[in-house]
Amino acid sequence: GKDNYPWIHIPVGYFKTMHNPKTDWCYKTEPDESMNNISIRYPRGKTLGGSSSINGLLYIRGQHRDYDIWRQLGNTGWGWDDVLPYFIKAENQERGKDEFHGVGGPLSVSDQRIHLPLLDEFQNAAEEFGIPKTKDFNTGDNHGCGYFQVTEKDGFRCSTAVGYLNPVSYTHLRAHETNQ
């Protein structure tokens, strides 16, 4: 469906969009013997913008080495050095442009606005156990503990619908909505 349901655009709204038949396909996994035959909910977006309209807004890229393994397995063009320019081009990073981030792209990426003393203490405790603090999980090395960035701008979600589809108005282009 359309992305005009108000809870889609408010970051805390994912509590109202996940497991909601209006915005989520409400899939479940098959029961698994290793988990006492229970199935797990598997939220998938049922709206323009797909799952980027109902998720927790986390912006975390994969590990450098994982992309390079994909390339080594024969997936030409999928190594870290191949995909990084596209990550940079896609971003509108509030921290500004650097070797890993871009500005001016359709996807708004920002720091979380709320920092909790408990989470700050958790980071300190992790550091005591050898897990480094990090301020950026998108450099290709996700090892560490810290606050992740989110796909949000000015307090509103930046889904693929908001970032890529809504800004474009082509008379010859239509997004087909379906109930399946």
Positions of PLM-derived features:
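Glycine-centered small-residue hotspots that permit tight backbone geometry or close packing
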Residues: G1-K2, G144
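N-terminal FAD cofactor-binding segment of flavoenzymes
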Residues: K2-P43
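A generic structural signal for short, solvent-exposed coil/turn residues
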Residues: H19, S34, H101, V168-S169
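Short, surface-exposed, polar/charged, turn-prone segments marking secondary-structure boundaries
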Residues: P21-C26, N75, D136-F137, V162-G163
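Rossmann-like flavin
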Residues: N36-G155
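A conditional alpha-helix N-cap/helix-loop micro-motif detector
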Residues: R157-A161
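N-terminal Rossmann-like dinucleotide/flavin-binding domain of flavoprotein oxidoreductases
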Residues: V162-Y170
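Single conserved hydrophobic/aromatic residue that forms the stacking wall/gate
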Residues: H172-Q180
